[in-house]
Design a protein with these regions (language model features):
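Nucleotide/phosphate-binding sheet-loop regions of phosphoryl- and nucleotidyl-transfer enzymes
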Residues: 1-243, 272, 278-281, 288-293, ...
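Structural motif
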Residues: 81, 264, 281-284, 302, ...
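C-terminal domain-closing interface element
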Residues: 182, 348-396, 402
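Flexible glycine-/small-residue-rich
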Residues: 184, 196, 284, 355-357, ...
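Glycine-rich phosphate/ribose-binding loops and adjacent secondary-structure elements
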Residues: 188-190, 288-296, 302, 308-315, ...
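Protease-associated
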Residues: 216-297, 361-367, 378, 382-386, ...
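A glycine- and small-aliphatic-rich helix-loop capping segment at beta-alpha/alpha-beta transitions
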Residues: 299-303, 319-326, 491, 637-640, ...
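Conserved alpha/beta-domain cores
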Residues: 374-377, 384-734
């Protein structure tokens, strides 16, 4: 065709006369004859040949591979529609002929608008093949793209009006967004094919709310058709889908959102960068609890190791920071700080990279992002979700800032405050370490006296952010050695700060070291061994609650949670001490707040003895991270190294740290809830592990009749939405 255009001395194939086109047809026939590929002259034989070719392509390796990639069955049959064609040829001055494609909503925002392409004297999808420059459908499209030739709207306004009207009717009938192929034959519009349109999460929300508002679907249908995880796009900045990406690494999408900034390789460097007004992307092999300040200061986090429930992933989700973990195609240079790619590219401190926590991609340079949007269609849909759900949704929040974010996302309180995270902030780690290294109770109490006002101030912020709502504060949980430095230089510096010899610090650190610390002296065992620690925390909680109530005039609901209980005698001993501290505070302040004492059920034994525990507990909350570890015998921090293989080979249906195991861990939880409620029917039952916003886990909690789930602040809307879907599913099963 290009040769024919050149020979005729014209600019496009539209200008070729009948003789030139006849010569093109003869040339094509000759080429096909040489290949012994001439099509049959008989129409029925042509159809049979076409069907045979389609069947061959469908059953071939390529067709099977494409079906497998989309979750289809390799042996699935082929359905073919044979229909009369509208050719899109034979137009003239009076009427256009040709073919085009049209869409009726923005792929990105879901806003209703007509857009597409039209190619004169064409058939099928030729308008998208780039053989000639097509007309844009509307004036607004033409102006936006700077195209000079008139749009179809300008050449044939009646056609675009008919297209828009057809789109509206079909959307109401199908209750879906779609794209269509159309043909103009002597000016007559014919729709030849419909197919589902590509949609962003924002567009899906807009369509669902529009349809429900117009009555085309019910509100329940609107809630059912949205994937809760797709709501992440509304809660965090996301990368502009049309922006080019220079991909340098791929990992797991541990925490959604996107951020661009200069690379740094230590938590300290991240803090310095943030203090200088140039917050950075923190890249580490993996993170530990002492890195939390650097993670808080960073725009985003990348780790070479780790899984979806690794320390980096959990903390980043709680902070609302984009995070990619397990980026195995990247490595960190040990000689000098640098990030190295599998292709040999090198990125040094200060080089700009982008972290896309939604896709797990690490990208060179800065990439344009879209701001989150919590109004309009999203807000309307969330309102419907809240009207529908039964299950309460609280937030895991460790600071006043976290609690305020959670309140903004309409959390019904705090389901878990991890007090240990507070000790890594500001100048608190030094008195905490002084307390740990103290050789006697008197020195330990002196250090705790220094920490007490800090804890009280923190708790006051939490109560003020959640007036009248429950605030569950977990007493100190991790083993004490986690708060001590590991490097020789840091140990020496700590010794100088505390006036201790380096050998003395090392000796005490060795005394605290354990072979299996996650099953060692942690949780309530720390509170029993060092009662002054829990006594300080309980006093700070109750004093903070009184302060918040008196200063703000708002009700407060403190709930004190004891971690890692496995024997009822542990609870009895600690509850007695908590009540004793409360009486002392009452005597000093001449007032008291109503408080609850509960247990974090994290061991299989605690689940089995939940009836006994319920006699002394006001509430129970399942810590599914540790409960999953102990039920499976898996280390959450190490499981990421083999979990993908287990899931791929079908040993596990999914990562049990990411989505609750209904059959094993879930059965223990149901046993515990039933035994607890048999003793105390009104006992509150919740879940506060990482699975708190996972839709499948939320559905389990709804079916089990739990009272609430708790998740990171930025996932509260997802849990609220999943709870609504679970309520709809449960009601439809009744």
């Amino acid at each position: 065709m290009h040769d024919a255009v050149r020979r005729a001395g014209v600019e496009s194939e539209e200008e070729l006369d009948a003789g030139a086109l006849a010569r093109v047809a003869e040339d094509c026939r000759a080429m096909l004859a040489e290949e012994d590929a001439l099509p049959p002259e008989n129409a029925r034989a042509q159809i049979a040949t076409a069907l045979a070719a389609m069947a061959q392509a469908w059953s071939g390796p390529g067709g099977q591979a494409r079906r497998a990639a989309r979750g289809g069955e390799a042996s699935a049959g082929l359905a073919v529609i044979v229909q009369v064609m509208a050719l899109g040829l034979g137009g003239g001055a009076e009427a256009l002929a040709g073919a085009g494609v049209a869409g009726f909503r923005s792929e990105t925002t879901g806003e209703r608008r007509l857009a597409g392409r039209f190619l004169a004297e064409a058939q099928g999808e030729e308008a998208l093949m780039g053989l000639r420059t097509p007309l844009l459908l509307t004036v607004s499209e033409r102006l936006a793209e700077g195209q000079r030739q008139p749009s179809l709207e300008e050449r044939a306004p009646a056609v675009t009006e008919a297209l828009a009207a057809a789109g509206r009717r079909l959307e109401d009938k199908l209750a879906e967004d779609f794209a269509l192929d159309f043909t103009l034959e002597a000016g007559r519009l014919q729709i030849t094919e419909l197919r589902p349109a590509k949609q962003s999460a924002r567009a899906a929300v807009r369509l669902a709310t529009d349809l429900a508002t117009r009555g085309a679907i019910t509100r329940a249908d609107a809630l059912r058709r949205i994937d809760p995880s797709a709501l992440e796009a509304h809660l965090h900045p996301t990368i502009d889908e049309s922006a080019p990406r220079d991909l340098i690494g791929q990992g797991l999408p541990a925490s959604p959102g996107a951020a661009s900034g200069p690379l740094v390789f230590t938590p300290e460097a991240a803090e310095v960068a943030a203090a200088g007004g140039n917050a950075a992307i923190l890249a580490l092999v993996e993170t530990s609890p002492e890195d939390i300040r650097g993670m808080h200061a960073a725009l985003g986090v990348v780790t070479v190791r780790g899984g979806m429930t690794s320390h980096a992933a959990v903390v980043a989700r709680g902070l609302g920071k984009p995070c990619v973990v397990g980026a195995k195609t990247l490595r960190l240079s040990k000689r000098e700080p640098a990030l190295l790619t599998a292709e040999g590219r090198r990125f040094e401190e200060g080089d700009i990279v982008t972290v896309d926590g939604g896709s797990g991609q690490v990208i060179a340079g800065a990439v344009e992002t879209r701001a989150p949007e919590l109004t309009g269609a999203f807000a309307r849909l969330m309102g419907w979700a809240d009207e529908t759900r039964r299950l309460g949704v609280r937030a895991n929040a460790d600071t006043g800032a976290d609690a305020r974010v959670a309140a903004g996302f309409e959390a019904a309180g705090i389901g878990l405050c991890r007090t240990e995270h507070m000790f890594f902030q500001g100048g608190r780690i030094t008195p905490m370490r002084r307390m740990i290294l103290a050789g006697n109770g008197e020195d330990r109490r002196a250090a705790l006296d220094e920490l007490h006002p800090m804890q009280r101030s923190d708790f006051t912020e939490l109560f003020r952010a959640m007036p009248g709502l429950p605030v569950v504060i977990r007493l100190l949980d991790p083993p004490l050695h986690e708060f001590l430095p590991h490097g020789q230089a840091e140990i020496a510096e700590l010794g100088r700060t505390l006036g201790l010899g380096e050998d003395e610090v090392l000796m005490r650190a060795r005394e605290l070291a354990e072979f299996n610390p996650m099953l060692g002296k942690r949780g309530c065992r720390v509170g029993i061994a060092y009662p002054e620690i829990y006594e300080m925390q309980v006093r700070a909680i109750l004093e903070a609650a009184i302060d918040a109530r008196e200063e703000d005039g708002q009700p407060v609901v403190p709930e004190i949670m004891i971690p890692l209980v496995s024997a009822v005698r542990e609870l009895a001993l600690l509850r007695e001490r908590i009540d004793s501290v409360a009486e002392a505070v009452r005597a000093e302040r001449e007032t008291m707040v109503d408080y609850s004492v509960g247990v974090m059920l994290e061991t299989p034994r605690a689940c089995l003895r939940a009836g006994e525990i319920a006699r002394l507990a006001d509430f129970i909350s399942f810590g599914t991270n540790d409960l999953t570890q102990m039920t499976y015998g898996l280390s959450r921090d190490d499981a990421g190294r083999f979990m993908p293989d287990y899931v791929t080979q079908g040993i596990y249906e999914h990562d049990p740290f990411h989505s609750l195991d209904h059959d094993g861990v879930g059965e223990l939880m149901q046993i515990a809830a039933e035994r607890a409620r048999a003793v105390k029917p009104d006992i509150s039952v919740g879940l506060c592990g990482e699975q708190g916003a996972d839709p499948s886990s939320v559905e389990f909690c709804e079916r089990a009749g739990f009272d609430y789930v708790s998740c990171s602040p930025y996932r509260v809307p997802i849990a609220r939405f999943a709870a609504a879907q679970a309520a709809i599913g449960r009601s439809s099963d009744l």
